[in-house]
A protein has these predicted regions:
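Basic, polyanion-binding surface patches
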Residues: 1-189
């Protein structure tokens, strides 16, 4: 038997993305965003409400996008709960350290295994309450300790987390269970 539910924001899994920008005075800022994903091969999209981060993006047009992990979950949750407009020292409270990105004017926080440097290319459906942001990925930074034997990022090593919008929780992503564009070959005739 199956149960029906009214429409909800239950696309699963939802990433826990940490958006890094600089405030007008050069202070690093970050926010937690779950509504985002791949837009095209070298582009991402993020659904944003009105935040200090949105103001920073309107001013600078550049950001970093990091992937939260089991180890960064508490601080990642905090930067999603607290507004940079009301708590200007919120990054200091997390203990995160950052340096300016090599390819964008945005902070790269040292505690995340993988970070994308991005430049805003388009805003869709912009209103007083927010917008859909399309950004070009100009570089991807991965800490070498999270690389697989083939030299590419290893998701299993990262212990990435996903947002559970149904029960308001965070879950770690699981183990590899198959090969994309390979496991299904056994059903091909």
């Amino acid at each position: 038997m199956k149960k029906n539910f009214k429409p909800k924001a239950w696309v699963l899994p939802q990433p826990v993305l940490i958006l890094g920008t600089y405030d007008a005075d050069g202070t690093p800022n970050a926010m937690n965003a779950a509504w985002g994903g791949q837009w095209d091969y070298n582009k991402i999209f993020i659904s944003l409400g009105s935040h200090a981060t949105t103001d920073n993006l309107n001013r600078l047009g550049e950001l970093t996008v990091a992937f939260a992990t089991k180890d960064t979950m508490t601080e990642a949750d905090y930067v999603g709960m607290v507004s940079g407009r009301k708590q200007p020292d919120k990054i200091e409270r997390t203990g995160w350290k950052s340096e300016r990105g090599e390819n964008v004017n945005a902070p790269v926080f040292d505690c995340f295994p993988m970070t994308m440097e991005c430049k805003v290319s388009e805003k869709l459906y912009e209103s007083e309450t927010g917008c859909y942001l399309i950004a070009d990925i100009v570089n991807i930074i991965c800490d070498e300790k999270y690389l697989a034997e083939d030299g590419k990022p290893d998701m299993e090593k990262m212990e990435l987390i996903t947002f559970d919008p149904i029960h308001n929780g965070y879950m770690t992503l699981g183990e590899r269970v198959g090969d994309a564009f390979g496991s299904g070959k056994k059903l091909m005739v």
